[in-house]
C-alpha cells in the first residue's frame, strides 16, 4: 500500500445522499444508482475504472447521512484532498463528508458491526412541501405509547422473516439482532431510530409500517411478539412504509453503542 503512481491505495469515505431521484445504491443496467455516479466521479479522478463497495444496498428513494464505502485508486491522491475532488465531480444530491486511508483488510460491508437507520414521519393535516422528499405523511393521530411498547418487542435476537420482503437472493439465515428501537416525537414529527447488527430486505420499513398500524389502533403492541414467535413468511398484515422517510444514519465498526436496550 505504498501510494506511488500505479500502486493501489485503499480509501474509506463517508457519503450523504438524497436518494429521491436514484434507484438505490447498487448499480443497475436500466436505472441510475448512486454507486454508478460515485464510480464515474472516481474514474474521472483516477483516469481508470474504479469499483466502489458500499456498506449497504439501500432501496430506491432511500436516503443516507452516513453511508460508508471503500475503493482503490492508482493515483496518489491525498485523502485530505479527496473530499473536495469528489464533490466537484458529484451532483448536489450526493456529498462526500469524510475520506481517509483504509487498511487492506477493511471492508465497508463485512467489517461493519452494526447500522443505525432512522425513519421520519410527519403527522398533521398538511405536510409542508419542503419536507415532502424526506418525511412520510400521516394525517391520522398516532398512539405514541403503544408504538413505543411495540418497538421494544423488536429488541433482541429474533427470526425477522415475518418483517422482510422477498428479496431476489438466498439467505443463510433470517435471524438478526436489534440492539435498540426508539420512537421519538417532537410536535408533528415522529422519528423511529433502530440499531441492529444487520437488516433483511425492507425489514426496517416493514417494522415501521407495523408500528404505524399499532399507532393507528389497527394492531396491538403484543402482535409484534406473536409475529416474531411464529417466524412465518410475511403476509399482507405487515405493510411496508414508504421509502422516502428512511435514512441510513450511521454504520458502526466497533461494538460501542450496540448493546441491547429497551426504552
Regions found by a protein language model. Name each.
Residues 2-263:
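Structured-RNA-binding interfaces characteristic of tRNA pseudouridine synthases
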Amino acid at each position: 500500500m505504498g501510494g506511488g503512481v500505479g500502486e493501489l491505495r485503499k480509501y474509506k469515505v463517508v457519503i450523504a445522499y438524497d436518494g429521491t431521484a436514484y434507484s438505490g445504491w447498487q448499480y443497475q443496467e436500466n436505472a441510475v444508482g448512486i454507486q454508478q455516479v460515485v464510480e464515474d466521479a472516481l474514474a474521472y479522478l483516477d483516469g481508470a475504472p474504479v469499483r466502489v463497495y458500499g456498506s449497504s444496498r439501500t432501496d430506491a428513494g432511500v436516503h443516507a447521512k452516513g453511508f460508508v464505502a471503500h475503493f482503490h485508486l492508482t493515483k496518489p491522491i491525498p485523502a485530505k484532498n479527496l473530499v473536495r475532488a469528489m464533490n466537484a465531480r458529484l451532483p448536489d444530491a450526493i456529498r462526500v463528508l469524510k475520506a481517509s486511508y483504509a487498511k487492506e483488510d477493511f471492508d465497508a460491508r463485512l467489517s461493519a458491526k452494526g447500522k443505525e437507520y432512522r425513519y421520519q414521519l410527519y403527522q398533521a393535516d398538511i405536510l409542508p412541501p419542503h419536507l415532502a422528499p424526506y418525511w412520510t405523511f400521516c394525517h391520522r393521530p398516532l398512539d405514541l405509547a403503544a408504538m413505543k411498547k411495540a418497538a421494544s418487542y423488536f429488541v433482541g435476537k429474533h427470526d425477522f422473516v415475518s418483517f422482510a420482503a422477498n428479496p431476489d437472493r438466498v439467505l443463510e439465515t433470517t435471524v438478526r439482532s436489534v440492539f435498540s428501537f426508539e420512537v421519538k416525537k417532537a410536535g408533528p414529527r415522529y422519528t423511529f431510530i433502530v440499531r441492529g447488527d444487520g437488516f433483511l430486505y425492507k425489514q426496517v420499513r416493514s417494522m415501521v409500517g407495523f408500528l404505524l398500524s399499532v399507532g393507528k389502533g389497527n394492531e396491538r403492541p403484543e402482535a409484534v411478539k406473536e409475529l416474531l414467535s411464529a417466524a412465518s413468511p410475511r403476509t399482507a398484515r405487515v405493510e411496508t412504509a414508504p421509502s422516502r422517510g428512511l435514512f441510513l444514519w450511521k454504520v458502526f465498526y466497533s461494538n460501542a453503542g450496540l448493546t441491547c436496550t429497551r426504552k
